[in-house]
Amino acid sequence: MGRKVAVLWHASFSIGAGVLYFYFVLPRWPELMGDTGHSLGTGLRIATGALVGLAALPVVFTLLRTRKPELGTPQLALSMRIWSIMAHVLAGALIVGTAISEVWLSLDAAGQWLFGIYGAAAAIAVLGFFGFYLSFVAELPPPPPKPLKPKKPKQRRLRRKKTAKGDEAEPEAAEEAENTELAAQEDEEAVEAPPESIESPGGEPESATREAPAAETATAEEPRGGLRNRRPTGKTSHRRRRTRSGVQVAKVDE
């Protein structure tokens, strides 16, 4: 039996059972209003239970068709069809048994119990109906996995740009530091330039002034890479002392 035939069979039996259930089982308005007799109502209730039970036949045929191992039907779908068959049979049996028991039981004495059983049978039948249709949903293959989102390479590029800028900034800072050091050295050399000579109190200004520039020119001609605090040497020994104001005073050793 194909799927379409099984669905049409099950749907027609389910709709017929639902219509009969509403008019002759619960709430059975025609019988309560006196339009139909009790014997006719009892027969239609038994027919309702039979239709509910027979609605399990298309479920059985579908189970037998899809149970073959070569089809690869999921176990969940098979289990749902088995439970649907059991629900249909149980609901039909409850309706038929309760309808037969009304022959000896009156509604005044056990009406609430009878209606309770009818309601439970209807709930079980609804579960069986939906279980059959949901079994087809369980046969569907799982949805394909969502594709992974590609990682954004822009962040890496930004980081590389930042690192490149940082690398460029480092040599610039080093060059600026070297320039400042060179400027400081030039300032120091400018401060150490030969100041004006001051006459000594001993009465020999000319000899002191002549010897002082000669000694300073000798120190200026020395290479810059040597020691800066090296004192000049000559025929006569001199000692220079720098005051806080930056003026050098030459003293002649007697």
Swiss-Prot record:
Gene Ontology cellular component list: plasma membrane
Here the segments flagged for biased composition (Low complexity) are 192-220
What does the record give as the function of this protein? Answer: Required for the import of both fatty acids and cholesterol during growth in macrophages and in axenic culture. Facilitates the uptake of these lipids by stabilizing protein subunits of the Mce1 and Mce4 multi-subunit transporters, which transport fatty acids and cholesterol, respectively. Required for full virulence in vivo.
Q: How does it assemble?
A: Interacts with the Mce1 and Mce4 accessory subunits Rv0199/OmamA, Rv0177/Mam1C and Rv3492c/Mam4B.
Top-level taxon of origin: Bacteria
Summarize the record's disruption phenotype note: Mutant is unable to utilize both fatty acids and cholesterol during infection in macrophages.
Presence of the UniProt keyword Lipoprotein in the record: no
Q: Where is this region: Disordered?
A: 143-254
Protein name (database record): Lipid uptake coordinator A
Sorted UniProt keywords = Cell membrane, Membrane, Transmembrane, Transmembrane helix, Virulence
Q: Membrane spanning segments where?
A: 5-25, 44-64, 85-105, 114-134
Q: Where in the cell is it found?
A: Cell membrane
Give start-end positions of Basic residues composition bias: 148-163, 227-244
Give the bilayer topology. Multi-pass membrane protein
Tell me where it mainly resides: membrane
* Compositionally skewed regions (Acidic residues) per UniProt: 169-191
